């Protein structure tokens, strides 16, 4: 049934035509409109997404800028600026805007620790820092309400190691923060030990660490090994760290090796730990590290071995058995190492006659003799101390070996140096060598060592030293000449007063000696 109000097809066609639009044009227009609508919608969606992305990036940028401003404020030397930065940080933590994972990106933990330890700040600011550290770690402040600010800081940092052990960023920042406290005072070291930090460090060392984290850990362990003779903890608290040190010595990273060697050197000054170090063969591992041709940490390892030998003779035999002498023998004549190596050998010499026997049998002393003749003064000086220590044993075999080395000329040339200590040692060595020569007299009863020394000009040097202003050197030189170098050209006179003309004064003196005059009472 038709609609009377609806126009017919023809009429509609006329209407389209009157509007100059036919059916095809209308279809095209609708298609264009639809395309335009879809395009607009697509543009709107893109713009909306772009705005959302921009808003997110701006929000992140604003957060980063705010966090950066807080980090910069903590590095200020003005307490007002520091306090403002702490207030902003604490507020954002309360609002859970920032987490520990975000904060460690700018090393907030280390910066807070640096402010706490190295800035002149009020107790209020210290309290705020301790509360902030607890908040960052996610610890309830009420639980530690009665603790001191120092305890709160250390507790929160140790808590981070156990809680966030899988995050290298957090561990690195935490290790650096604890190191900051320990550098400030050994009291903080003992506080950390009371918080059972050693077990946490042992657990952290078992994970697969990056080089940066391993360096941070080894540096922290080294700080725990320093100054153990002051406010000493129990040895059982420190002994577990030796396993970390052992792994550090065998590391491929030079910085880790360096800190491990420094740790051993520091431990050598604390006798209670010697037994534990010996069980793990730490010094033997140091020697093995020194033997490694690819070790970039060789100078520090060498210095660590030197410090250990200086501090104690407990490990000398262990290191010699591990091949230390063979290693040093190869380094003695290396120009840039000879001084330090000769210094180590001179310290080894004082361990006793058996050690000197090993130095002789290994050929180390013969290499030292070459240093006496070829190297610059500082190396020759240390080599001379080696020879002096060998002579000081007074063992005939050692003295004979020194004479046979053929370096007495270079050795006695150092008598003209300005080092009073060295000259005194050399004079003592010459005296012992001349004593040895008296036991090996030639058929004409002459001292072969005295003859040899005189041939190389030693006697002239001794006569020169007799005029020294140093009483010690003067006495030593005069004693040697007086005993071993009698002047054969001087006329022998049994009576030193032969030809002396007596007079009346001599008679009076003799009479006074025979008959002493008794003092008479004084009277007016």
UniProtKB/Swiss-Prot annotation:
One of its GO terms (molecular function) is nuclear localization sequence binding. Disulfide bonds: none annotated. Adult germline tissues. Residues 1-42 are annotated as: Disordered. It is found in: Cytoplasm. Residues 1-59 form the IBB domain. Belongs to the importin alpha family. Binds specifically and directly to substrates containing either a simple or bipartite NLS motif. Promotes docking of import substrates to the nuclear envelope. Seems to act as a cytosolic receptor for both simple and bipartite NLS motifs. This is Importin subunit alpha-1. The gene is ima-1.
């Amino acid at each position: 049934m038709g609609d009377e109000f609806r126009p017919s097809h023809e009429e509609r066609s006329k209407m389209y035509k009157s509007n100059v639009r036919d059916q095809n044009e209308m279809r095209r227009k609708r298609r264009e409109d639809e395309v335009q609508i879809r395009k607009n919608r697509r543009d709107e969606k893109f713009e909306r997404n772009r705005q959302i992305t921009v808003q997110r990036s701006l929000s992140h940028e604003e957060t980063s800028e705010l966090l950066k401003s807080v980090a910069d404020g903590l590095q200020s030397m003005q307490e007002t600026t520091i306090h403002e930065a702490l207030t902003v940080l604490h507020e954002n933590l309360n609002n859970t805007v920032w987490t520990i994972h975000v904060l460690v990106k700018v090393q907030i933990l280390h910066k807070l620790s640096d402010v706490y330890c190295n800035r002149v700040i009020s107790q209020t600011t210290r309290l705020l820092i301790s509360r902030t550290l607890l908040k960052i770690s996610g610890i309830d402040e009420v639980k530690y309400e009665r603790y001191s600010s120092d305890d709160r800081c250390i507790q929160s940092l140790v808590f981070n190691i156990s809680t966030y052990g899988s995050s290298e960023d957090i561990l690195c920042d935490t290790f650096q923060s604890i190191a900051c406290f320990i550098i400030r005072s050994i009291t903080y070291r003992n506080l950390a030990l009371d918080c059972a930090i050693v077990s946490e460090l042992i657990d952290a060392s078992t994970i697969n660490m990056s080089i940066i984290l391993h360096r941070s850990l080894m540096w922290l362990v080294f700080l725990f090994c320093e100054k153990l003779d002051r406010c000493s903890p129990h040895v059982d608290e420190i002994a577990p760290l030796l396993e970390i040190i052992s792994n550090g010595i065998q590391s491929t990273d030079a910085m880790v090796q360096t800190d491990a060697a420094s740790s051993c050197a520091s431990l050598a000054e604390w006798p209670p730990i010697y037994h534990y170090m010996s069980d793990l063969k730490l010094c033997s591992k140091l020697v093995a590290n020194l033997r490694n041709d690819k070790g970039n940490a060789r100078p520090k390892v060498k210095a660590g071995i030197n410090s250990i030998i200086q501090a104690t003779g407990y490990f000398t035999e262990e290191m010699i058995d591990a091949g230390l002498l063979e290693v040093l023998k190869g380094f003695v004549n290396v120009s840039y190492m000879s001084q330090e190596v000769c210094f180590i050998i001179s310290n080894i010499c004082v361990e006793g006659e058996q050690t000197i026997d090993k130095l002789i049998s290994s050929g180390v002393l013969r290499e030292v003799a070459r240093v006496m003749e070829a190297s610059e003064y500082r190396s020759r000086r240390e080599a001379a101390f080696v020879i002096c220590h060998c002579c000081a044993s007074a063992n005939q075999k050692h003295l004979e070996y020194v004479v046979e080395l053929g370096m007495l000329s270079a050795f006695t040339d150092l008598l003209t140096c300005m080092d009073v200590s060295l000259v005194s040692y050399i004079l003592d060595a010459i005296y012992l060598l001349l004593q040895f020569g008296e036991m090996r007299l030639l058929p004409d009863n002459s001292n072969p060592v005295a003859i040899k020394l005189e041939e190389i000009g030693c006697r002239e040097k001794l006569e020169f030293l007799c005029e020294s202003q140093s009483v010690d050197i003067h006495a030593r030189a005069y004693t040697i000449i007086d005993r071993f170098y009698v002047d054969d050209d001087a006329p022998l006179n049994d009576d030193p007063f032969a030809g002396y003309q007596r007079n009346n004064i001599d008679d009076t003196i003799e009479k006074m000696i025979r008959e002493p005059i008794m003092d008479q009472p004084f009277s007016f």
